[in-house]
C-alpha cells in the first residue's frame, strides 16, 4: 500500500498542475467516464484531477489496503472497534432483507425488529392522539433532549424531511447552556409536550441537566404524577430511567455495537419517526440499505462510497488538501454539513494507527460547509481565489417540493452548476482583461485590475444529483457518506469507531466545576486557567 501511495505522490506535482479545462476540451467523454450512478443518484467526479492512471492506482490502493476485507468484517459483526472490543453494526439497523447478523454467535435481527416495532407503535399512538398528556390533551410538541449523535442526526434528518411532517412539531435541545432549553420551553405548553431523553447511560451531563430542567417544567405545572405521561427515553440504563420517573413501556434501547454518530437508524431516530411516521421512517431505512448492498456488491470503479473514499484519501493524503467543503444546494439540508462534520471528524480525527504507532502522513480533513446559495455570499471567495485548495462537494435535487416556485429551483440549479464549472475552468488573465476593456476600461488600468479578477481554476469538486429529497434519498445519502468515512479510515489505518478525543475535556470539566462554583481553589491549575476562573468570577458577582 505504501508503494502505491508513493506512486500517487510522485504524480502529485503534475496533478496539481493539471489543466482541467484542457482535459475536458481534449476528452468529450470525460463526464461519462468519470461519473457513476446508483439509480437516480449521480456522482460526478470528472471535475477532480482523477485520470485513468490515477484511477487504476486508487483501485489498486483499495485492494492492497484491504478495504473489501475490512468491509466484510464490519458487515459480518467482527469487533473491528478493537479499542472498545465492539462490533460496528449500524448497518444491521437498516437490514431490510432481515438476513441474520451475528454478534458473538447470536442473531441481532430479532431484537432490532422488536425495537423498531415498539418505536412504530409508540409513534403511531402519539401521532394519533391515542397516547395523551396527563390532562387528556393530545401531544402537539415533541422535544428531544440529547447531544452529539443523540442530537445531530435527528435534528438534521427532521429538518431535511420537513415536507413529510404530519405529526407533532419537533424541537431539539442539546447545549448545556440554559438558554437553549429556556428558548424552546417558551414555545410549548406543558400539557401537550412530550420529552424524549436520549442517553444510552442516562449519565451524559448535558443531557441529564437539561432533562432535569424539563422534568421540573412538567412537575411544577402539572404535578409529579404527570411526569410519566410526558417523558420517554432512549437508553439502556433501565434503573436510572425508572428512578427519573419514566415508565419502562416508554423506554427504547439500542446496543453497544451502535456508535452515537451512526445511531440515527436506531431508537435515537424516534423523534424523526414521530414527525414523519413509521412508514416514511421505513423508507429512510430502505434508502440506506440500498447503499449498503451497493457498497458490498458493486465493483470499485462503479461503487459510489468506494470512489468517494478513495478520492477523499487522495485529496487529503496525497495532494495534502487540509479541508473539505460540504455544499448542499438545499436549504433543508442546512444541518447536513454539521452532521458530516461529526461523522467524519470524530471518526477519522485520529493520530494513532491500528498498530498503536503515529499515523504516517495525514488522517481525516476538517469538514465544514453551509447550504447554497448562502455560502456563495460568505466563504466561496476563499474557495475560488484563496491560497488553499479546498475540494468542494455539491449536492442538488432535480425536483423540489414547491412546484409553484419552480423558477426559484431553476435558479438554484443554475447556481450550483455555475459554481462547479467556475471552480474547474477559472478565468485567465486575458479573459479578465478583455471583460474589463469591453466595458470601456483603458488598457493600462485593465492590466492593473485584471489580476484581481483572475480565477486559477483547477479546483476540484464532486457533484451529486438526485431526483428529490425524499426519506429514501436522504437515507441513501447518509449511508453513502458513512461508508466513505469507513473507506478513508481503512486507508488511514486507524480505528474510525472510537472517540477517545472527547474524553479528556469532559474529565477536566468535572474537576473544574467545584472551582467554578467557588468550592475549591484553582491553585492546582495552570496560570491561564486560574486567570480565566478569576476573571469569570469577578464578572459573575
Curated annotation (Swiss-Prot):
Keyword hit for Isomerase: yes
Gene: pgi
PROSITE patterns: P_GLUCOSE_ISOMERASE_1 (PS00765), P_GLUCOSE_ISOMERASE_2 (PS00174), P_GLUCOSE_ISOMERASE_3 (PS51463)
Enzyme class: isomerase
Record key words, sorted: Cytoplasm, Gluconeogenesis, Glycolysis, Isomerase
UniProt xrefs under InterPro entries: G6P_Isomerase, G6P_Isomerase_C, Phosphoglucose_isomerase_CS, SIS_dom_sf, SIS_PGI_1, SIS_PGI_2
HAMAP family according to UniProt: G6P_isomerase
Protein name as catalogued: Glucose-6-phosphate isomerase
EC number per UniProt: 5.3.1.9
Its biological purpose: Catalyzes the reversible isomerization of glucose-6-phosphate to fructose-6-phosphate.
Pathway: Carbohydrate biosynthesis; gluconeogenesis; Carbohydrate degradation; glycolysis; D-glyceraldehyde 3-phosphate and glycerone phosphate from D-glucose: step 2/4
Catalytic activity field: alpha-D-glucose 6-phosphate = beta-D-fructose 6-phosphate
Entry similarity comment: Belongs to the GPI family.
Subcellular location: Cytoplasm
Catalytic residue positions: 346 (proton donor), 377, 506
Main location: cytoplasm
Domain of life: Bacteria
Any one Gene Ontology BP term: glucose 6-phosphate metabolic process
Assigned GO CC terms: cytosol
Pfam assignment, any one: PGI
NCBIfam families in alphabetical order: PRK00179.1
Lineage, uppermost ranks: Bacteria, Pseudomonadati, Pseudomonadota, Alphaproteobacteria, Hyphomicrobiales
Gene Ontology molecular function: carbohydrate derivative binding; glucose-6-phosphate isomerase activity; monosaccharide binding
The UniProt record lists the keyword Ion transport: no
SUPFAM superfamilies tied to this protein: SIS domain
PANTHER family according to UniProt: GLUCOSE-6-PHOSPHATE ISOMERASE (PTHR11469:SF1)
Amino acid at each position: 500500500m505504501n508503494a502505491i501511495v508513493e506512486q500517487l505522490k510522485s504524480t502529485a506535482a503534475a496533478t496539481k498542475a493539471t489543466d482541467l479545462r484542457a482535459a475536458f476540451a481534449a476528452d468529450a467523454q470525460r463526464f461519462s467516464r468519470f461519473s457513476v450512478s446508483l439509480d437516480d443518484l449521480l456522482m460526478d467526479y470528472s471535475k477532480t484531477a482523477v485520470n485513468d492512471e490515477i484511477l487504476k492506482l486508487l483501485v489498486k490502493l483499495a485492494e492492497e489496503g484491504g478495504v473489501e476485507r475490512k468491509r466484510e468484517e464490519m458487515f459480518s459483526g467482527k469487533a473491528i472497534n478493537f479499542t472498545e472490543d465492539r462490533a460496528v453494526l449500524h448497518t444491521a439497523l437498516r437490514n431490510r432483507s432481515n438476513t441474520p447478523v451475528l454478534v458473538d454467535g447470536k442473531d441481532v435481527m430479532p431484537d432490532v425488529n422488536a425495537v423498531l416495532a415498539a418505536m412504530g407503535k409508540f409513534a403511531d399512538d402519539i401521532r394519533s392522539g391515542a397516547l395523551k398528556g396527563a390532562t387528556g390533551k393530545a401531544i402537539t410538541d415533541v422535544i428531544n433532549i440529547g447531544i452529539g449523535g443523540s442530537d445531530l442526526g435527528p435534528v438534521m434528518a427532521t429538518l431535511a424531511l420537513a415536507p413529510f411532517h404530519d405529526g407533532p412539531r419537533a424541537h431539539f435541545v442539546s447545549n448545556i447552556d440554559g438558554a437553549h432549553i429556556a428558548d424552546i420551553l417558551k414555545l410549548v405548553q406543558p400539557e401537550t409536550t412530550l420529552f424524549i431523553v436520549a442517553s444510552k447511560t442516562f449519565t451524559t451531563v448535558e443531557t441529564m441537566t437539561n432533562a432535569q430542567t424539563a422534568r421540573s417544567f412538567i412537575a411544577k405545572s402539572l404535578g409529579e404524577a404527570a411526569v410519566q405521561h410526558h417523558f420517554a427515553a432512549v437508553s439502556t440504563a433501565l434503573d436510572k430511567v425508572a428512578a427519573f420517573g419514566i415508565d419502562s413501556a416508554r423506554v427504547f434501547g439500542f446496543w453497544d455495537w451502535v456508535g452515537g454518530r451512526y445511531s440515527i437508524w436506531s431508537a435515537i431516530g424516534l423523534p424523526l419517526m414521530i414527525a414523519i411516521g413509521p412508514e416514511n421512517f421505513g423508507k429512510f431505512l430502505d434508502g440506506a440499505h440500498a447503499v449498503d448492498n451497493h457498497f458490498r456488491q458493486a465493483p470499485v470503479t462503479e461503487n459510489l462510497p468506494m470512489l468517494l473514499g478513495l478520492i477523499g484519501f487522495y485529496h487529503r493524503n496525497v495532494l495534502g488538501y487540509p479541508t473539505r467543503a460540504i455544499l448542499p444546494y438545499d436549504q433543508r439540508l442546512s444541518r447536513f454539513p454539521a452532521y458530516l462534520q461529526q461523522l467524519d471528524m470524530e471518526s477519522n480525527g485520529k493520530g494513532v494507527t491500528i498498530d498503536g504507532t503515529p499515523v504516517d502522513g495525514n488522517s481525516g480533513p476538517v469538514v465544514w460547509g453551509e447550504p447554497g446559495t448562502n455560502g456563495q455570499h460568505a466563504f466561496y471567495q476563499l474557495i475560488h481565489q484563496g491560497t488553499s485548495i479546498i475540494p468542494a462537494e455539491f449536492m442538488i435535487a432535480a425536483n423540489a417540493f414547491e412546484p409553484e416556485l419552480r423558477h426559484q429551483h431553476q435558479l438554484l440549479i443554475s447556481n450550483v452548476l455555475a459554481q462547479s464549472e467556475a471552480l474547474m475552468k477559472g478565468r485567465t488573465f486575458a479573459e479578465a482583461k478583455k471583460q474589463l476593456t469591453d466595458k470601456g476600461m483603458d488598457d493600462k488600468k485593465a492590466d492593473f485590475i485584471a489580476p484581481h479578477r483572475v480565477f486559477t481554476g483547477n479546483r476540484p469538486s464532486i457533484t451529486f444529483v438526485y431526483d428529490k429529497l425524499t426519506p429514501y434519498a436522504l437515507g441513501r445519502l447518509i449511508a453513502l457518506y458513512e461508508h466513505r468515512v469507513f473507506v478513508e479510515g481503512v486507508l488511514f489505518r486507524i480505528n474510525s469507531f472510537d472517540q477517545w478525543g472527547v474524553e479528556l475535556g469532559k474529565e477536566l470539566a468535572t474537576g473544574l466545576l467545584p472551582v467554578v462554583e467557588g468550592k475549591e481553589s484553582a491553585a492546582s491549575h495552570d496560570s491561564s486557567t486560574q486567570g480565566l476562573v478569576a476573571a469569570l468570577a469577578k464578572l459573575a458577582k
